[in-house]
């Protein structure tokens, strides 16, 4: 093979069954509408189980009672997860009140789950409530289109309330990119909103009739914050500002964290720098990256289909040149940018427009009324009186944005009375887990239900070694698909089996290095024993300001991952 093309541009071979399903779906319609009327089962059937994902839903069941129901010869208790499309995480208080009501009245679990992709999910929607949820979202100007499956998913944007002008500009671009890359099929409107079938033929000028080979994730990032974890994403626009005003973006392509246990052809990968582009080329470049991946991505193997694998197969320079050709531009050299952190600043922060922003820590993003901590009711009360908006962060927290000085005390009173401002340790603020059991069908080990007590134990270790005012970026994900973004943490736990995890070390605080597996298939006591020893060493031996992940690399405890496509599994 020549240097120019390390591998073929298009992978030949038998297409996956998902490709057949998309082709035969009549632009994502399938027989979803007919399935909705089938009262004999609580779930969708056949291809529709996968097709509903394009409409923002996953079919799930309660795994806590799966075996019990099987013994009783009952089908699993099917219910849908629905994920809203919410570019940049901004939601109005009117929209919040509508979703609060729906969650309370029409879902099994009664909760709103904030996700690390800056949106919210409902868990436990019975089939009879599926159409009503889409109609409720539509009535307040929201939808769930393209938040799952082989499309451009929810577009993230740094939650930067301090520089309001820059955030407003970046947020507008996140919305524009999201709209530009949406599917054009009318299937969503016909099925869920009862809109008339139009005589014209469906066309998908950007995504194509069989859509993308695999999921595709996009971010807009405002340095020095990397709160959206750009290296977990396929396409990233890093905001470059002059005098506080947005002038263009650095483009980074080909990040992604999902792996498969034991499959060395899979790897987490940091995104590659392509170059700088002025603002006016943003949509053309976004489209060019997506269509290049559409045409070159591997449709014969879904485990090798993401943009990161395409880049490694054809070479970064070849992919970049094709994007330039399709967009009709030449990238300029990357402009300087630097990341200093990725956590949220919990509490009140004053923006440059003299408004205040209150960032509330929501453990694991789960909003529910707990005994003595009515979080859900408290947020509803704030939504009723707050004139600004709410912003969901990529750390699963919530910002009450744009609070005038005169309203501060009123909002703080509700937040405190509801347990929304309870003091937590820096360690808890910088820890995160995906949903996992009982609803996720892919879960191998607990994550969300495991994290709170696990962090209690970590807090005890931090106190024992005199570093309780410090933090380690710590994440738990229930399976190697990696929704909890453990593969960008300083300490990442990846679920292997019930009660067992792979322990990864050596990421860094700012999320620019992939961690390496340190110990495999170990239990919580074994994890804590390892971390006890390592935290003690870090506390005693670290250099000034040295994070835990950087220390583990410098001290030779773990080798850094330099080229994950080739050395992640070594």
UniProtKB/Swiss-Prot annotation:
Enzyme class: oxidoreductase
Binding site for [4Fe-4S] cluster: 434, 440, 479, 483
Pathway note: Sulfur metabolism; hydrogen sulfide biosynthesis; hydrogen sulfide from sulfite (NADPH route): step 1/1
EC number(s) per entry: 1.8.1.2
Gene Ontology biological process terms in this record: cysteine biosynthetic process; hydrogen sulfide biosynthetic process; sulfate assimilation
Family: Belongs to the nitrite and sulfite reductase 4Fe-4S domain family.
Subunit structure: Alpha(8)-beta(8). The alpha component is a flavoprotein, the beta component is a hemoprotein.
Listed name of the protein: Sulfite reductase [NADPH] hemoprotein beta-component
Source organism per UniProt: Shigella dysenteriae serotype 1 (strain Sd197)
Gene: cysI
């Amino acid at each position: 093979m020549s240097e120019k093309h390390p591998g073929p541009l298009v992978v030949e071979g038998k297409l996956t069954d998902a490709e057949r399903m998309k082709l035969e779906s009549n632009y994502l319609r399938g027989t979803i509408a007919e399935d909705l009327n089938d009262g004999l089962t609580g779930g969708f059937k056949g291809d529709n189980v996968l097709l509903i994902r394009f409409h923002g839903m996953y079919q799930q069941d309660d795994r806590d009672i799966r075996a019990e129901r099987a013994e009783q010869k009952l089908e699993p208790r099917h219910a849908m997860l629905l994920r809203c499309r919410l570019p940049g995480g901004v939601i109005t208080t009117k929209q919040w009140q509508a979703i609060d009501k729906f969650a309370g009245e029409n879902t099994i679990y009664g909760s709103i789950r904030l996700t690390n992709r800056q949106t919210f999910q409902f868990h436990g929607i019975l089939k009879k409530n599926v159409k009503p949820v889409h109609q409720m979202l539509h009535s307040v100007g929201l939808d769930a289109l393209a938040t799952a499956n082989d499309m451009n998913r929810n577009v993230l944007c740094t939650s930067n309330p301090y520089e309001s002008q820059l955030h407003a500009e970046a947020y507008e671009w996140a919305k524009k990119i999201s709209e530009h890359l949406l599917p054009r099929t009318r299937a969503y409107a016909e099925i869920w909103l009862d809109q008339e079938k139009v005589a014209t033929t469906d066309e998908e000028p950007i995504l194509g009739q069989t859509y993308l080979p695999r999921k595709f994730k996009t971010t807009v990032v405002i340095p020095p914050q990397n709160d959206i974890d750009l290296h977990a994403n396929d396409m990233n626009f890093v905001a470059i500002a002059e005098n506080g005003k947005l002038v263009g973006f650095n483009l980074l392509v080909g990040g992604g964290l999902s792996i498969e246990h034991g499959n060395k052809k899979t790897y987490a990968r940091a995104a590659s720098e392509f170059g700088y582009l002025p603002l006016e080329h943003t949509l053309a470049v976004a489209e060019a990256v997506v269509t290049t991946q559409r045409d070159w991505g591997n449709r014969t193997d879904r485990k090798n289909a993401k943009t990161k694998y395409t880049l490694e197969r054809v070479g970064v320079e070849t992919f970049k040149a094709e994007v330039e050709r399709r967009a009709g531009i030449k990238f300029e050299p990357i402009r300087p940018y630097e990341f200093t952190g990725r956590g949220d600043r919990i509490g009140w922060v004053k923006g440059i427009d003299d408004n205040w922003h209150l960032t509330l820590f929501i453990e694991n993003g789960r909003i529910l009324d707990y005994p003595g901590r009515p979080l859900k009711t408290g947020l509803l009360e704030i939504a009723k009186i707050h004139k600004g908006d709410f912003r969901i962060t990529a750390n699963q927290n919530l910002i009450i944005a744009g609070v005038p000085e005169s309203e501060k005390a009123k909002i703080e009173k509700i937040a405190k009375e509801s347990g929304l401002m309870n003091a937590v340790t820096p360690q808890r603020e910088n820890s995160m887990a995906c949903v996992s059991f009982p609803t996720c069908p892919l879960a191998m080990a607990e994550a969300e239900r495991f994290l709170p007590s696990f962090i209690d134990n970590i807090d005890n270790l931090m106190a024992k070694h005199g570093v309780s005012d410090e933090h380690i970026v710590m994440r738990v994900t229930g399976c190697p698909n990696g929704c909890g973004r453990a593969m960008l943490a300083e300490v990442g736990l990846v679920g292997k089996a019930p009660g067992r995890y792979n322990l990864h070390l050596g990421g860094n605080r700012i999320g620019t290095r992939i961690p390496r597996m340190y110990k495999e298939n170990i239990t919580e006591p074994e994890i804590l024993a390892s971390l006890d020893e390592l935290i003690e060493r870090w506390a005693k031996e670290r250099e000034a300001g040295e994070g835990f992940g950087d220390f583990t690399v410098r001290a030779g405890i773990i080798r850094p991952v330099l080229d994950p496509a080739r050395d992640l599994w070594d």
